[in-house]
C-alpha cells in the first residue's frame, strides 16, 4: 500500500473539490482542473480533507492505484492553489528565445529559427533572452512542454551547450587527448 496515500489531502483555503459520476473537479484561485477517476479507487471529501481509498472489489495490489490517484489529486490541488513552474536556461553562443504571440521562437544554432506553439493553459515568458519560464496549473502539461523545449537542443557533454533545466547538472566528458611524442 502507498504510504503517502494513507494520509488525507488537506485542502488549502479557497480550494474546492467536487465529485460527479466518475470525475473529480478541483477549483481554486488560479483556475480549475478535472480528472476522470478509475473504478478501482474511491474518493471521499470530508470537510477540508480528501481521502483516497481502493475500491472494495480490488484485490490485486490496491496500493498502486491508490497512490497514483492520491498524487494526481494532490498535484491538482497544488496547481489550482499555487501553480507550477519550470525554468530552462539556454547556454551557447547566439542562443536566444522570444515569445511571439502564441509561439515560442528559439534560436539554437541551426540555420532556421525553431518555432513551437505554446499549449493553451500555459504562460511562457523569457528573461534576459536565455532564461525561459513556463508556468501553469497542470503539472503534466508544464513538465511535458518543458521537456519538449529541452529536447530541441539537449545539453551536450563536451562543452555543455544546449537547453537545460535551471540548476540541472550536466555530466561533462573530457575531449580528445592531444598526441604526445615525436613522429
Swiss-Prot record:
Record-linked Pfam families: Ribosomal_L6
Oligomeric and partner information: Part of the 50S ribosomal subunit.
The keyword Transferase appears for this protein: no
Organism: Chlamydia trachomatis serovar D (strain ATCC VR-885 / DSM 19411 / UW-3/Cx)
Gene: rplF
NCBIfam families named in the record: L6_bact
Keyword Protein transport: no
Cross-referenced InterPro entries: Ribosomal_uL6-like, Ribosomal_uL6-like_a/b-dom_sf, Ribosomal_uL6_a/b-dom, Ribosomal_uL6_bac-type, Ribosomal_uL6_CS
GO BP annotations, alphabetical order: cytoplasmic translation
Signal peptide residue numbers: none
Name the UniProt record assigns to this protein: Large ribosomal subunit protein uL6
The entry's keywords: Ribonucleoprotein, Ribosomal protein, RNA-binding, rRNA-binding
Function text: This protein binds to the 23S rRNA, and is important in its secondary structure. It is located near the subunit interface in the base of the L7/L12 stalk, and near the tRNA binding site of the peptidyltransferase center.
Similarity annotation: Belongs to the universal ribosomal protein uL6 family.
Any one GO cellular component localisation term in the record: cytosolic large ribosomal subunit
Organism taxonomic ancestry: Bacteria, Pseudomonadati, Chlamydiota, Chlamydiia, Chlamydiales
Molecular function as annotated in GO: rRNA binding; structural constituent of ribosome
Amino acid at each position: 500500500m502507498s504510504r503517502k496515500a494513507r494520509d488525507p489531502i488537506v485542502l488549502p483555503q479557497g480550494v474546492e473539490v467536487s465529485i460527479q459520476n466518475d470525475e473529480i473537479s478541483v477549483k481554486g484561485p488560479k483556475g480549475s482542473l478535472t480528472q476522470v477517476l478509475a473504478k478501482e479507487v474511491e474518493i471521499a471529501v470530508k470537510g477540508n480533507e480528501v481521502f483516497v481509498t481502493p475500491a472494495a472489489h480490488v484485490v490485486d495490489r490496491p496500493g498502486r492505484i491508490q497512490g497514483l490517484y492520491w498524487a494526481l489529486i494532490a498535484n491538482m490541488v497544488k496547481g489550482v492553489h499555487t501553480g507550477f513552474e519550470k525554468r530552462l536556461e539556454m547556454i551557447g553562443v547566439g542562443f536566444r528565445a522570444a515569445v511571439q504571440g502564441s509561439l515560442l521562437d528559439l534560436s539554437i544554432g541551426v540555420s532556421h529559427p525553431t518555432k513551437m506553439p505554446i499549449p493553451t493553459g500555459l504562460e511562457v515568458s523569457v528573461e534576459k533572452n536565455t532564461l525561459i519560464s513556463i508556468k501553469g496549473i497542470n503539472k503534466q502539461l508544464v513538465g511535458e512542454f518543458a521537456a519538449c523545449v529541452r529536447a530541441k537542443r539537449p545539453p551536450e557533454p563536451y562543452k555543455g551547450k544546449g537547453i537545460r533545466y535551471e540548476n540541472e547538472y550536466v555530466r561533462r566528458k573530457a575531449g580528445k587527448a592531444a598526441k604526445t611524442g615525436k613522429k
